[in-house]
Curated annotation (Swiss-Prot):
Taxonomic lineage from the root: Bacteria, Pseudomonadati, Pseudomonadota, Gammaproteobacteria, Enterobacterales
Enzyme category, top tier: isomerase
Taxonomy, superkingdom: Bacteria
InterPro entries recorded: Dimeric_a/b-barrel, L-rhamnose_mutarotase, Rham/fucose_mutarotase
Active site: 22
Protein name: L-rhamnose mutarotase
Keyword Transmembrane helix: no
Gene3D superfamilies hit by this protein: 3.30.70.100
Organism: Pectobacterium carotovorum subsp. carotovorum (strain PC1)
GO biological process: rhamnose catabolic process
Principal cellular location given in the protein's record: cytoplasm
Protein family according to the UniProt entry: Belongs to the rhamnose mutarotase family.
Subunit structure, interactors included: Homodimer.
Length: 104
C-alpha cells in the first residue's frame, strides 16, 4: 500500500461550503475511489491558513491517477472549483508532500 499526502487550499469564505460538500461526498465518487484502490482517505482543514491536508493509502499509483479520467471525478472537480483554487482542467491545485517519518 502506498501512502500519499498532499496540500490544497480553500478560499477563506468557503470553509463551510467545502465541509458541507464533503459530508457526504457523492456515493458514485466514493465508489470510484474505492474501486480504484483508495483506502483511509482523509482531508483535514486548517482554518487559520485556509489549508487542506489530504492523506490516502492507495494500492497503486496508476490506479490512483486513473481516477482523474473518470466522469464522476471530472464533475466533482468542476463542482468544487468555486470554493478552492483550481487548475485549467478544474483539478484542485495541490502539492504532494514528501514523507519524513512513519511508525507502523
Amino acid at each position: 500500500m502506498l501512502r500519499k499526502a498532499f496540500v490544497m487550499s480553500v478560499f477563506p469564505d468557503c470553509h463551510d461550503d467545502y465541509q458541507r460538500r464533503h459530508n457526504p461526498i457523492w456515493p458514485e465518487l466514493a465508489e470510484v475511489l474505492k474501486n480504484h484502490g483508495a483506502h483511509h482517505y482523509s482531508i483535514f482543514l486548517d482554518k487559520q491558513r485556509n489549508l487542506l491536508f489530504g492523506y490516502v493509502e492507495v494500492e497503486s499509483e496508476a490506479r490512483w491517477e486513473a481516477i482523474a479520467q473518470t466522469e464522476v471525478c471530472q464533475r466533482w472537480w468542476k463542482y468544487m472549483s468555486d470554493v478552492m483554487p483550481s487548475n485549467p482542467d478544474n483539478s484542485p491545485v495541490s502539492e504532494a508532500l514528501e514523507p519524513v517519518f512513519y511508525l507502523d
